[in-house]
Structures are given as C-alpha cells and as structure tokens.
Amino acid sequence: MAMPNFNDMMKQLQQAGAKMQDVQKQLEKITAVGDAGGGMVKATVSGKQKVLSIAIDPEILDDIEMVQDLVVAAVNAALEKAADLAREELSKAAGGMLGGEDMLKNFNIGQ
C-alpha cells in the first residue's frame, strides 16, 4: 500500500487556501437584489450576506405592518440569491480540490 505524499498534500492545501482567499474577494464584489410586493420593497445584499441597502416605495408607507413584512421578504429573497451566488463561486474554486462538491456541503451556505 502506497504511503501518501505529504509534500503533495501540503501543496494542495496551500492551493486550496489561495483559491478560498480569491473566493472571499469575489464574494465582496457580488451583490444580489431581492424584492417583494411587486418591487415596492427592494433589498440589496453582498455575497458575504451583509445588507447593503433597502429601498421602499413611498406609496406603501401608510401601512407599517405591510412594510415590515415586505422588508423581511425582500431581505430573505436577496440573501437566498447571494447564497446561491456564493455556492457557485465556491463550487468553481473547489472543483476537484479536496473533494470538490462534497467539501461544499460542509459550508452550509444559505441552508
């Protein structure tokens, strides 16, 4: 039975680390927009799951409960889109390295 080559394993780990740093930089650049109420409320989030902005159509400001519900729905929609984009970036970076797709299950992004 062949012994694993630890130098090769270390090299792979270093390459994976560099790719993950690249992914982190890409996630900072990604934005996703979610909307609710037919676009009456829009939320923009980053690929790192941070809310960047909320836009509310002034026409709906009379109904606070509806505004609150729509803000929650818009933010959740945007976060879901951002999580999908983050998974795509991680999948591209992980392709073939350290288990590829199976490794991504450990990140639990957006789940």
UniProtKB/Swiss-Prot annotation:
Keywords from UniProt, A to Z, are: Cytoplasm, DNA-binding
Q: Does the keyword Cytoplasm apply?
A: yes
Into which family does the record put it? Belongs to the YbaB/EbfC family.
Highest taxon of source? Bacteria
The name this protein carries in UniProt is Nucleoid-associated protein Cphamn1_1179
Q: What does this protein do?
A: Binds to DNA and alters its conformation. May be involved in regulation of gene expression, nucleoid organization and DNA protection.
Q: Which organism is it from?
A: Chlorobium phaeobacteroides (strain BS1)
UniProt cross-references to NCBIfam families, sorted A to Z: DNA_YbaB_EbfC
